[in-house]
């Protein structure tokens, strides 16, 4: 039976912890993990890491560091996410909306794919989004999906005109009206 890759939770907010665990692998084997995602401009970003399977046939990113030459070093369960780079090194990660991101994770042994899975990170599924156009005031309100009074946060974009949809949605998911 091939090794099994579990990423928990399968669906989570972008600021929640993840557990990447491979089980059922041959102790001492060297496995490669590649994680990829597309940004809002449909550019692919990816990270890679090489691990030695422990004596119990497990790789757990909460307990093990990747081998040298990986995208990150040290024990870091979120290393596969923050260490992603684009094929074009001058590119910036583009988010045009607060849509969920679907990641693809592949495990390889000796260059051959042995298992894969997908997982999703979102900015706040449980929020309402409302456009505001009142005279000279234009904006977007993000709020929890209930009618309870909530503390408010105002997000102001800088001179670059950055889109703050993701930040607004994420804060609303934590109980703020933004």
Walk through the language-model features, giving the residues of each:
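Ser/Thr-rich low-complexity repeats and stalk/linker segments
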Residues: 35-85
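N-terminal cap/lid segment of alpha/beta-hydrolase-fold proteins
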Residues: 3-13, 18-29, 42-55, 92-151
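Conserved binding-pocket/active-site segment within a compact domain
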Residues: 141-142, 156-157, 168
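Short amphipathic alpha-helix adjacent to the substrate-entry channel of hydrolases
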Residues: 163-178
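Active-site glycine-rich loops that stabilize anionic/oxyanionic intermediates
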Residues: 150, 157-162
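Glycine-rich phosphate/adenylate-binding loop and adjacent beta-alpha elements
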Residues: 75-100, 159, 173-176
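Beta-strand-rich binding/interaction modules
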Residues: 29-35
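Hydrophobic beta-strand anchors of alpha/beta hydrolase catalytic cores
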Residues: 153-155, 178
